[in-house]
């Protein structure tokens, strides 16, 4: 709103005019009378009206937004003050006070005119302080009044006929008690209220001036009245006065007691009200927490009674409460172990009873041989296989190879895609594997890298899926393709995309490293084909207690790069998946290398498989130019830069020229990547330690040509298909022949030319044997220095100076998994108190795991599992001994009758057996005595030989001669920890934990002995097994320390078991 031009300069903008509403102000009338100022008045009026509206609006908002409680109290005080001020300013109150004063004056005048005024008590006497009367004086006065009343009554009866009654006094009788008199007509105003007293005391005047209520505290007291002669009064006046006085006295006595009782009741009510107010003012949060504490106490008592613990009563000592707390801690530890055991079994897929499941029937034989194939005899078929890179088949009733795509019986959509891709004829592995798979046979396909193995199992899979009804909801996939690496799974998924579109088949790629929620969503929508890694497939099958997906409809399983998959430790996951699939499902295994040791595992999974081998088991393609250079490690990087420069000059006309550099470690890949970046080369690194997103982005950029160089570990040696890849450099030599074949196979794919250069140092001579073998198999040139290195190492092996390198992908992951299983079982048995079947790791080194041959007989699996209640630690018992701890813990078992006979020498045992055969009896007691003496003498002889005869014989000769150590404690316990897992031992014996244990328990804890591996026992006279010695003069402290150590070992054992479960799927230096 614009400002008025007539605003006064001495006022603020929002303040009203001081004389705006003051009608008595002279300027007001003059302003109205002055016509020249009329417009200004109107402007000021409108301005002030708008200003008042704004002020009222602000006042309303403040009232609405005010603090309720505070403002109410403030307004209450304000209203009371305003009411008091208003009563003081009101003229009506003054008139009422004047009327009361006039009524009091009339009352005094009437009292003066009354005849009773002659016996009025002097006000000075009435105002005197009362003198307390004794009981005798009260009785005497009452008796005198009674006699006076009798005389007056007798006089009245004698003169009742003749005497005329005197007029009664209209004045009220004199008040003889401390209570105020009852109101009469003289003491009432015109409206029936008592008049104001004429002579109020100064105290009453001051209280009336300060307070708005005329309330005063009244004291009940009796006045000491003077005696009077009843003869002075005539007529009934004396009677009335005396009787009224007597009644007043009686009423006063009664009122004193009544008032005291009422005051006591009032105080009790006030106390009750205060308590009620205190209860009402209690904080709701405090009340809620108090109720929770009571409920917790009740629940703890109920749990303690249910568990058989003694519940401590109120006022019990802290010792009983400490025992209950220790029991609770132990229960929590056992619950923690049960939870860990449940988690370890969470991803377990128990095999179902296939005989009780009604599976849908399916068809897996689709191949119908064409006429030209039917007319071909076996000799012609062998010639065709020989022309196609020497195809070798093992198995019965193998189909004949096919040379054109139309003879496979594929859908028309697949043929259109094949024509669009420009594939003229099938490759060797495709010509033989596709007819075999489409005939419904289990197949093992072994072919060189880049030979089209992926299409060899994809086309039969699509025909197989197309024959069945679509998947609806969460029925599960029809076909499952498993690969060892995420990159290979993604590549298979991309390669089958063109076929999926034309056939209207849904597929999902489920690999680790990404969120599982997307995979779960895809499974719920339904997918006929799932391309996955084994670990992620297990996660999907166990997600939400198996309600996400299942493999009941799965009838086609592919394991690509099967040997690498088992070598990386995927055997448990793969076997779980296969055991859950129906036994009649079709299974296919493909790989470029398939060692003979893997055949037993393959035949365990497959049923009468056909083994198809193209070009040898581990052979580099002839299109690849292989070069091997022997040089020192310091010169490798310089030579690498020279090769990159030379190749760049040779292929400068080619825009798409890619290079793949292999190293053996993730750190080496990152270091070499940084070195190449500093030299100006655009490159990327690829290894298992990188996130999945980074790995996918690196492969995508490499295939697109944005990054021409990639430094990778062997994680990229499988399935990476880049047609423009012309150069592969093995910066670090591969450690076995199969790895060399797969690394070199990344180039020269689909008939293209490629180059593979390998660096090997003199320190890596053990790898030279496999490289020479691979070069010989592929008929490549072998350098002289490499041949000399290989022959030298073979000579060392023959002489026993060196050990041969590993044979590559031979299933070493299976042995590693088996060892881990033994470690886990041993840890569980040790933790649960059973060490009878503990085995030494050294006894399992180099052991060959036997595989049972696959049979057609199906046996329902055992589904009985131990419950979680078995995971308890009740077997952990430690004896608390009353006495000082021994100086040395014996490493040999204590002699007892159970092991008495077993501990005898071989000659003694032979003599006993001979005596039994001859029928001679042997007394058990005599035998025990003899055995004890023999054992003692044998030990003494051994000790003398070791030079310990004096130390061992002295205690035996004089057992009581040993003096007690003044620092020895009264109680001790020995807690053995040698057989617990390493994580549990470390957790119980680290410095911080030992300090904490001593502070909590108050006992002394020291570590004795040394660690012995499982299966190894201490030698005679050697240090005992690792244990903890607990000492204290208080038994409760020793017991508390034992319980605390027990809890720590339980938690450490749980963590060790979980670590073994997590590490089961990953092993070796190859990470997924």
Swiss-Prot record:
GO molecular function terms attached to this record: ATP binding; ATP hydrolysis activity; nucleic acid binding; RNA helicase activity
List the PROSITE patterns hit by this protein, alphabetically: DEAD_ATP_HELICASE, HELICASE_ATP_BIND_1, HELICASE_CTER, Q_MOTIF
Q: Where is the composition biased (Low complexity)?
A: 1-19, 193-204
Q: Does the keyword Hydrolase apply?
A: yes
Q: Which residues are ATP-binding?
A: 447-454
Q: Does the keyword Transport apply?
A: no
Predominant subcellular localization, coarse grouping: nucleus
Q: Which GO terms describe its cellular component?
A: nucleus
Query: Which intervals of the chain are annotated as region Disordered?
Result: 1-219, 245-293, 803-839
Q: What class of enzyme is it?
A: hydrolase
- Entry's Gene Ontology BP terms: mRNA processing; RNA splicing
Compartments (UniProt record): Nucleus
Q: Show where the record puts the motif Q motif.
A: 403-431
Q: Where is the composition biased (Pro residues)?
A: 170-183
Q: Which protein is depicted?
A: Pre-mRNA-processing ATP-dependent RNA helicase PRP5
Q: Which gene codes for it?
A: PRP5
